[in-house]
Amino acid sequence: MYRLMSAVTARAAAPGGLASSCGRRGVHQRAGLPPLGHGWVGGLGLGLGLALGVKLAGGLRGAAPAQSPAAPDPEASPLAEPPQEQSLAPWSPQTPAPPCSRCFARAIESSRDLLHRIKDEVGAPGIVVGVSVDGKEVWSEGLGYADVENRVPCKPETVMRIASISKSLTMVALAKLWEAGKLDLDIPVQHYVPEFPEKEYEGEKVSVTTRLLISHLSGIRHYEKDIKKVKEEKAYKALKMMKENVAFEQEKEGKSNEKNDFTKFKTEQENEAKCRNSKPGKKKNDFEQGELYLREKFENSIESLRLFKNDPLFFKPGSQFLYSTFGYTLLAAIVERASGCKYLDYMQKIFHDLDMLTTVQEENEPVIYNRARFYVYNKKKRLVNTPYVDNSYKWAGGGFLSTVGDLLKFGNAMLYGYQVGLFKNSNENLLPGYLKPETMVMMWTPVPNTEMSWDKEGKYAMAWGVVERKQTYGSCRKQRHYASHTGGAVGASSVLLVLPEELDTETINNKVPPRGIIVSIICNMQSVGLNSTALKIALEFDKDRSD
């Protein structure tokens, strides 16, 4: 019997044995020919032998000493795969990595860890990142869930709120109109929107212009309506900044001014006492303001003006920086009047030109594929869905949805326009940028009296925050030039960062724009600071690129 079993087993394992003849039999029968084989007796004998062999082999195994299972051989079959480790984290589909991404394997691994850190620190349900190098997307990935309830993982195609990055998109519309001679940035806004009343500040007639609106210098309020609280907070921040600057200058010059230390200390204590009530935490933050959760649908930007057009200016236009999303609502109305088109129609044309085909205004009714859900933690520290909001009153300042891929395209279009003028002499065949080089230089030039809340080293420019190149000491920290904008909405956070290459003559003569790193990150959790993470990721890729 043992010999019978061995013979049967050997035949089954041999090439062209049982499995092979079963395959031939199936093909033969499908062709309508008589079945192959040695007759029913041979088949019965073979089946009996197999059954006895399996039973006997089972008995022999029971008597044999236990052995660890053999490691799988990846070359045994083209379909064979190594065993997968079990993980509690959701599987996140990724876009197949382009060949050029292999050059950035180290940067990708390091950046993925940075992304995990910020996600874990804030408890974000999901986060998506995209990176491009010199105009080519080299990495995009999602971590966590786009929809926690239905266990839908984040992926590169996930659509989320981009919040205030919408301001940078609106700036392109304004810039195109300015380039076409249809918009004057420096005349009163009433020339285009007479529905917005003329303003006074402390009894003096003042002018609000498009340029001031773009850089948040118009004095128009943000979500906080209490002018006293806003002014107290500004005073406290100014005092704090002054103290930091004085300390820095003293350290730099090596002077202590010990004689006046006591007097200065006493004065500072008095000033701080005056401003103590306006410290962060006393004043409501944006997410505690009722207007952020509006559910009313507005038909157009002109109609949205009624929310704030009759409110007093908080500061004299041009004198102080006051970040204002409502200022961009007024800019949307200016776009409509200067272009003769509805704001959303004009923006859709721009998105089409830039190949940003998944970027749309956020509306509840339309089916938007791959749209994420948005979350916040309640007072009991439990994850909950955010309430329904209608963003039609602020399309221009924070009402668009997009993907990391579309944001990379937008960033590269801006970087190309910024750099193409430098390459024209060495390559006359280059296409023009979507915006002219002089326009991009204007947009990315810091404006006096402004602030950049997400990086104190920078200033606000024209719908972008800009950090300029700076190095104070030799062989010490070098501050890179970059432009970025962050976003914070109900249940969402975002950032788009552009790190231009520091160009030299060799690069200009042998390469083509855009030259630099673009990073976009979107997250379905509010109040997540992403700019520093985006900058670290950009520098990781820049390091690999340089090597």
Curated annotation (Swiss-Prot):
Keyword check for Acetylation: yes
Annotated compartments: Mitochondrion
Chain positions with N6-acetyllysine modification: 297, 342
MF GO annotations: identical protein binding; peptidase activity
Compositionally biased tracts (Low complexity): 62-83
Superkingdom of origin: Eukaryota
Catalytic residue list: 164 (acyl-ester intermediate)
Sequence segments annotated as region (Disordered): 62-96
Protein purpose: Mitochondrial serine protease that acts as a regulator of mitochondrial lipid metabolism. Acts by decreasing protein levels of PISD, a mitochondrial enzyme that converts phosphatidylserine (PtdSer) to phosphatidylethanolamine (PtdEtn), thereby affecting mitochondrial lipid metabolism. It is unclear whether it acts directly by mediating proteolysis of PISD or by mediating proteolysis of another lipid metabolism protein.
Protein name per the record: Serine beta-lactamase-like protein LACTB, mitochondrial
